[in-house]
Amino acid sequence: DIVLKLFYGVFEKENVITRAARLENHGETAIELEKMLSFSMDLMYENYEMIYFSGRHAMERTAERIPVQHAKVEIGSTRGTSSHHYNPAVILCEEGAGETHGSCIGACLVYSGNFVAAAQKDQKNQTRFQMGIHPTNFCFHLEKGEAFDTPQAILSYSGTGLTKLSQQYHEIIREHICRGAYKHAKRPILINNWEATYFNFNEEKILKIAEQAQKLGIEMLVLDDGWFGKREDCLLYTSDAADEARSVD
């Protein structure tokens, strides 16, 4: 009555396999789905390390590295967003692997919500590696005939270190996820006034920045926070375009 389908995509050029799963309710009653991951992988090698990425403003995607042992190693986010605070991408590499040597397996979710990634040795020192939507606060109601699809996971392997793995992810994301006119073109250059002025700006200051930027070949100026209403510091409210512009015409 319940059917699980596994979906694999093979991108030979990029050395990537994608994996997702679908659960279909063909029964007569509704079900509550409380946990469903994008992949679960069993590995024979004994001594893995997990590399994951956390961070904050001005210190984005800081790599941290910990050994995988019999106690479960688990990272994730339940904030509803991922971004550079806790990135939904992890690497499982052999002990001591570096940029140009050692085997490593990457896993990246095409999803920016709550996620979990876990690895653990079993009693025979084999490693189970899993990743998907975080089960905390997750409950999906499936009526008869309905289905649930997990986010897609992008899996890649390198036998020659982390640099090759990174390059393979660059390629798959550039070729198959990035969209728009600038997918394979140089992007226009823009300048943002925020770090130069913060909230303290007027028309004269903005025009001076624009004039200097134009001389350098910069093609666009982005007017940042503070152009609307009475927002003169970070403690005041944010607003929208309906507010009267306070500093520039």
Predicted regions and their residues:
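Single conserved hydrophobic/aromatic residue that forms the stacking wall/gate
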Residues: 237-249
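Polysaccharide-binding surfaces and accessory modules of carbohydrate-active proteins
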Residues: 1-120, 136
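Short Pro-Gly-centered flexible turn/kink motifs
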Residues: 140-159
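Short acidic, Pro/Gly- and aromatic-enriched capping/linker segments at domain boundaries
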Residues: 127-141
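Terminal connector regions
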Residues: 162-176
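Aromatic-lined carbohydrate-binding/catalytic grooves of carbohydrate-active enzymes
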Residues: 184-239
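Short, basic/aromatic beta-hairpin or loop at an interaction surface
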Residues: 119-129
